[in-house]
């Protein structure tokens, strides 16, 4: 049986509302959720907050509908980048950034989208759904992102709220699918209220409208989400690890870098 995930429940100052989001997600059958803290740099030296602790939300975790297991709550950081300088916080491997289970980036220009796909150490690249896409997707950076294991995220709650956003969501999603062919795509809610979350099978049906095949639409709320989580674990654990290889010791007689006269002396 598939394990469903919603990797974008919006964090807010109201913990009671956040509890309601998590409880509703568990009731709808989601086994994993991520509480998303979104940062948009309006000041040069803006601090990244620590993630919300699960212990602050629940003493006992809600049970997933039909699973008899408690829901798993992860933390996520999304950084909106509209200027190249905003990427520095990711390149500097900030200690606050490493506290989050998932790190996503929302690039606002084509150049920053290219950088996010090819260079930034992130798990997700967010696709705009609330306005017309400001650039065309190109195959090379998207293929690099797929090879690196980076996912692409589409949000569905804006499409529920507004008919204009619905058109943008479907149009931008179809443009993405033409290039990535449904690979590494996840669909999340970005829900701020419990009523904005839909069940995983309903979300998979929305995926068909976004241009995904039936199998890719289901993967967008299950296996592709798991791949993002594994990518995040690898990113966190691989930081600071150095691989060493022991070089076999060679005798002076076998060393080609020695002068011929010295090598002859060694052999004698």
From Swiss-Prot:
Its main location: nucleus. The gene is RPP30. One of its GO terms (molecular function) is ribonuclease P activity. Component of nuclear RNase P and RNase MRP ribonucleoproteins. RNase P consists of a catalytic RNA moiety and about 10 protein subunits; POP1, POP4, POP5, POP7, RPP14, RPP21, RPP25, RPP30, RPP38 and RPP40. Within the RNase P complex, POP1, POP7 and RPP25 form the 'finger' subcomplex, POP5, RPP14, RPP40 and homodimeric RPP30 form the 'palm' subcomplex, and RPP21, POP4 and RPP38 form the 'wrist' subcomplex. All subunits of the RNase P complex interact with the catalytic RNA. Several subunits of RNase P are also part of the RNase MRP complex. Disulfide bonds: none annotated. Keywords: Acetylation, Nucleus, Phosphoprotein, rRNA processing, tRNA processing. It comes from Bos taurus (Bovine). The modification N-acetylalanine is found at residue 2. One of its GO terms (cellular component) is nucleolar ribonuclease P complex. The keyword Glycosyltransferase does not apply. This is Ribonuclease P protein subunit p30. Belongs to the eukaryotic/archaeal RNase P protein component 3 family. Component of ribonuclease P, a ribonucleoprotein complex that generates mature tRNA molecules by cleaving their 5'-ends. Also a component of the MRP ribonuclease complex, which cleaves pre-rRNA sequences. The modification Phosphoserine is found at residue 251. GO terms for biological process: rRNA processing; tRNA 5'-leader removal; tRNA processing. The keyword S-adenosyl-L-methionine does not apply. It is found in: Nucleus, Nucleolus. PANTHER family: RIBONUCLEASE P PROTEIN SUBUNIT P30, RIBONUCLEASE P SUBUNIT P30. InterPro entries: Pol/histidinol_Pase-like (IPR016195), RNase_P_p30 (IPR002738). Gene3D superfamilies: Metal-dependent hydrolases.
């Amino acid at each position: 049986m598939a394990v469903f995930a919603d990797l974008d429940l919006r964090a807010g100052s109201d913990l009671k509302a956040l509890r309601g989001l998590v409880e509703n997600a568990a009731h709808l059958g989601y086994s994993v959720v991520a509480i998303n803290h979104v940062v948009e740099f309006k000041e040069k030296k803006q601090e990244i907050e620590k993630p919300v602790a699960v212990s602050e939300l629940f003493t006992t975790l809600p049970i997933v509908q039909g699973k008899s297991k408690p829901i798993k709550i992860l933390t996520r950081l999304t950084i909106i980048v509209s200027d190249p300088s905003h990427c520095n916080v990711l390149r500097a491997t900030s200690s606050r950034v490493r506290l989050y289970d998932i790190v996503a980036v929302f690039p606002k220009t084509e150049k920053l989208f290219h950088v996010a796909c090819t260079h930034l150490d992130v798990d997700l690249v967010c696709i705009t759904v609330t306005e017309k896409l400001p650039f065309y997707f190109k195959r090379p950076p998207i293929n690099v992102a797929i090879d690196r294991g980076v996912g692409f995220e589409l949000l569905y709650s804006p499409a529920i709220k507004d008919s204009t956003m619905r058109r943008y969501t479907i149009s931008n999603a179809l443009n993405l699918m033409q290039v990535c062919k449904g690979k590494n795509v996840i669909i999340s809610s970005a829900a701020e209220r419990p009523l904005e979350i839909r069940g995983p099978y309903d979300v998979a049906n929305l995926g068909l409208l976004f241009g995904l095949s039936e199998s890719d639409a289901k993967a967008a709320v299950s296996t592709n989400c798991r791949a993002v989580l594994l990518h995040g674990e690898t990113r966190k654990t691989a930081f600071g690890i150095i691989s060493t290889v022991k070089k076999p010791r060679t005798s002076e007689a076998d060393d080609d870098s020695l002068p011929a006269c010295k090598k002859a002396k060694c052999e004698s």
